[in-house]
């Protein structure tokens, strides 16, 4: 119930951070059956409920009401998904989104969830591109296809749908790019150098080059 009166923007950014913390352990190199179950269930709950809780926050702000019982169920979905993401990352790892977001947190006054939201679509696209070029037999390619199916509800969805779906979600929730927080092209070289050695980067499903990392940040501005 403490989440009912959160501003919609805060609900959106923290919800997208929770989603990131479910996606990254699912596709990372240390994914395992325990974390897979947590991630699949958590992602399903986010897909079902994130838009609803953001919309309900706007209703609360306007009318001062927590809304119908289904809103309580959606809030519970997001709380459970957040818990599952924490358990998953602790038992598998993260990836390039947090590998970049961690150092960026010390360079700019930007909300962590908003940073993750801005980076998430670009990282998904870059990982898929790199996997297909440099690791075409990687299990992670199948995981991205499964992720696409979880996000879209389409059993035939391919991995390319992940970044498209995420871009639409971030745009629909009104999350701005990193430029809104003062991050510009001049920050990219330093950020990339810090990201390369970030602990979260170690479990990314494929090693990304400095050029690829720079392109991700540029696309998130």
Task: Give each language-model segment a name.
Residues 1-92:
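Carboxylate- and glycine-rich phosphate/diphosphate-binding segment that chelates Mg2+/Mn2+
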Residues 16, 43-46, 97, 116-117, ...:
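A general structural signal for well-ordered alpha-helical segments in protein cores
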Residues 19-23, 78-86, 120-123, 166, ...:
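Short alpha-helical scaffolding segments that buttress acidic/His motifs in well-ordered protein cores
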Residues 107-110, 114-187:
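Gly/Pro-rich interdomain helix-loop hinge
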């Amino acid at each position: 119930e403490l989440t009912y009166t959160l501003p919609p923007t805060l609900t959106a950014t923290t919800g997208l951070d929770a989603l990131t913390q479910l996606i990254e352990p699912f596709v990372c190199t240390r994914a395992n059956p325990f974390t897979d179950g947590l991630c699949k269930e958590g992602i399903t709950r986010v897909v079902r409920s994130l838009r609803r809780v953001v919309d309900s926050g706007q209703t609360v702000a306007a009318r001062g009401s927590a809304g119908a019982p289904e809103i309580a169920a959606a809030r519970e979905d997001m709380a459970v998904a957040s818990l599952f993401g924490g358990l998953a990352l602790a038992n598998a790892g993260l990836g390039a989104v947090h590998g970049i977001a961690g150092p960026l947190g010390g360079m700019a006054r930007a909300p962590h969830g908003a940073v993750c939201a801005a980076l998430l679509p670009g990282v998904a696209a870059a990982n898929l591109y790199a996997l297909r070029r440099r690791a075409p037999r990687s299990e992670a390619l199948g995981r991205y296809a499964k992720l696409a199916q979880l996000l879209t509800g389409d059993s035939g969805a391919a991995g390319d749908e992940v970044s498209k779906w995420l871009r639409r979600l971030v745009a629909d929730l009104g999350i701005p790019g990193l430029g809104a927080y003062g991050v510009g092209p001049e920050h990219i070289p330093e950020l990339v150098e810090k990201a390369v050695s970030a602990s979260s980067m170690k479990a990314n499903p494929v090693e990304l080059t400095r050029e690829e990392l720079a392109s991700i940040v540029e696309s998130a501005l």
